[in-house]
């Protein structure tokens, strides 16, 4: 009887998703207090959360309010300590993995392909790192993924609200809208024209909800148009011309050169794309274009996602000269994991129909890739190497 129960659990379609979520959550919690000091931009956002709690004002007006409120809520619930600073990010990062899996399934990827993509996503270094620290990025990326999933589920009202919420966590989330416009235009199974509700509600929800979230911080209502102007002015003030930070880099450098960025040294929090993902960026993007041309919805969506959250950064960087860092690539990781999941699953399907002589080298190569991905994770994250 117990063996039958275990077999049914193993055969459950959400088994691998749950296992990935449980393992990554456990790893997050195992390092939540290490270090006990503020990591990188936690210096800005945790200190700002303290200032909000003490003074009902923000020291970081260049950013919208929602992600700040998540960090404030963590400190309020768990205290001004590493648990309070980082638990909201960890919980959002855990939700993010589940959302990603269901996005894959909504794109008609097989359960195996979705599991492969989710495995790569869950154990990708940047994805894990930015869910481990009290920075703004994991909040807007998770809300952006909710936006993607709601759009794919044809929940157009909610999708419009959620991209507004994502932008209220960090303005960069606005780059999540072009992928859906591209997908809507080019998809062979074009979604309903009610998608216009998403387009309308995205800016409306941003403008309407921002004064409410700002009020939660300052207890005063502020003009949302003036706040938008303030955020755009302040966020564009740091340029490559007037900034000397050693880690700044242009978007095209992120894929042409391997650029690790130290978040913390002991234990080492290394800001870098997992080599197992970085090394395949260009082939995977070309593969997704090929799949999109062949009518594959996941290939189209994956490329559109890559275009919106990364390729658009290149003209933006040239036009504005605004400083950027390699961790700005983080919102694009999911697109590449979709492409890798599609490709690896297709290779496995092809190998299964071949002779043993042809099958063995293909399957061996896939196993080596998975081991390389895990090895990259072990080397880059502070979970296993803490000295």
Residue spans for each PLM region:
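Transmembrane-helix motifs of polytopic, lipid-linked glycan transferases
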Residues: 83, 87-108, 146, 287-290
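Short helix- or helix-capping micro-motifs
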Residues: 24-27, 117-122, 149, 163, ...
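Specific aromatic-rich, kink-prone transmembrane helix
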Residues: 99, 120, 139-158, 162, ...
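Perimembrane helix-loop-helix junctions
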Residues: 2-4, 152-153, 158, 163, ...
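Membrane-lumen/periplasm interface segments of specific transmembrane helices
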Residues: 193-258, 263-264
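Transmembrane helical bundles and short interhelical boundary loops of multi-pass, membrane-embedded
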Residues: 2-5, 182, 198, 202, ...
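Transmembrane signal-anchor helices characteristic of membrane glycosylation enzymes that use polyprenol
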Residues: 12-39, 201-221, 370-380
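Short acidic/glycine- and proline-prone juxtamembrane loop motifs at membrane-interface regions
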Residues: 39-40, 89, 126-137
């Amino acid at each position: 009887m117990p063996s039958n129960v275990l077999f049914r659990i193993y055969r459950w379609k959400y088994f691998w998703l749950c296992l990935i979520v449980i393992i990554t959550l456990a790893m997050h919690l195992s390092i939540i207090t290490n270090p006990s000091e503020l990591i990188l931009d936690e210096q800005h956002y945790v200190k700002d959360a303290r200032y909000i709690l003490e003074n009902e004002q923000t020291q970081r007006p260049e950013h919208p309010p929602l992600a700040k409120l998540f960090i404030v809520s963590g400190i309020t619930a768990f205290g001004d300590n590493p648990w309070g600073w980082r638990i909201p990010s960890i919980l959002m990062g855990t939700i993010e993995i589940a959302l990603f899996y269901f996005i894959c399934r909504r794109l008609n990827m097989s359960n195996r392909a979705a599991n492969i993509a989710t495995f790569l996503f869950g154990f990708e270094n940047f994805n894990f790192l930015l869910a481990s620290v009290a920075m703004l990025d994991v909040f807007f990326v998770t809300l952006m993924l909710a936006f993607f999933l709601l759009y794919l589920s044809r929940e157009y009202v909610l999708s419009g609200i959620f991209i507004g919420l994502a932008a209220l966590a960090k303005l960069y989330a606005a780059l999540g809208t072009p992928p859906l416009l591209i997908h809507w235009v080019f998809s062979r199974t074009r979604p309903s024209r009610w998608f216009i509700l998403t387009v309308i509600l995205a800016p409306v929800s941003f403008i309407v909800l921002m004064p409410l979230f700002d009020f939660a911080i300052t207890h005063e209502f502020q003009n949302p148009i003036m706040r938008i102007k303030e955020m755009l002015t302040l966020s564009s003030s740091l340029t490559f011309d007037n900034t000397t930070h050693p880690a700044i880099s242009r978007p095209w450098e992120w894929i042409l050169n391997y650029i690790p960025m130290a978040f913390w040294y002991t234990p080492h929090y290394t800001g870098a794309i997992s080599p197992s993902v970085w090394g395949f960026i260009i082939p995977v993007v070309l593969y997704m274009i090929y799949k999109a041309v062949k009518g594959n919805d996941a290939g189209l969506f994956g490329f559109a996602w890559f275009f919106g959250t990364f390729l658009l950064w290149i003209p933006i960087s040239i036009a504005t000269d605004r400083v950027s860092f390699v961790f700005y690539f983080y919102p694009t990781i999911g697109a590449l994991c979709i492409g890798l999941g599609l490709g690896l699953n297709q290779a496995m399907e092809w190998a299964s129909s071949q002779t043993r002589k042809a099958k063995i080298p293909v399957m061996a190569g896939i196993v080596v890739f998975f081991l390389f991905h895990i090895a990259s994770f072990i080397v880059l994250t502070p979970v296993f190497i803490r000295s």
